[in-house]
């Protein structure tokens, strides 16, 4: 995660990469660039506590039980639970959480449509858990740059040109290949 200050807005910005999430109560901005990945921007509108995650794959298909929980930064099932838990620990109330979904583009046309699986997972998770989606910009063939202001709930989305697709696709392929080589570790509370 990279921290910087945007001089134009005078706001602290956190740039998250695949497998990361960030939660804040402060007047900060969280940003990321998405291809087939999904980001959920989630907040409690009463407390202003909000956060964003960025995940590459829907679920860890190798996990068969609590002893095999994977690193929370790899898969959507753990990324969503960890984001929600961090929001609750920061003072958000579960029944007030609002979800905004972004990404899931098909930017790698020669491979499996990972974005489609990510979108399906995100919808299943949100509806199964009883949360509500208040906004979305998902699917299609475009990568996206997301700027999220958790205090206000405002999101700015820029659809990027196709020329960004090749570098983003290469980055996503490297990330997918590295996931399987990392040891299973981490702790997550599934509720």
Curated annotation (Swiss-Prot):
The keyword Transcription regulation does not apply. Pfam families: CheD. One of its GO terms (biological process) is chemotaxis. GO terms for molecular function: protein-glutamine glutaminase activity. It is an enzyme of class 3 (hydrolase). Keywords: Chemotaxis, Hydrolase. InterPro entries: CheD-like_sf, Chemorcpt_Glu_NH3ase_CheD, Cytotoxic_necrot_fac-like_cat. NCBIfam families: PRK13487.1. Probably deamidates glutamine residues to glutamate on methyl-accepting chemotaxis receptors (MCPs), playing an important role in chemotaxis. This is Probable chemoreceptor glutamine deamidase CheD. It comes from Hydrogenovibrio crunogenus (strain DSM 25203 / XCL-2). The gene is cheD.
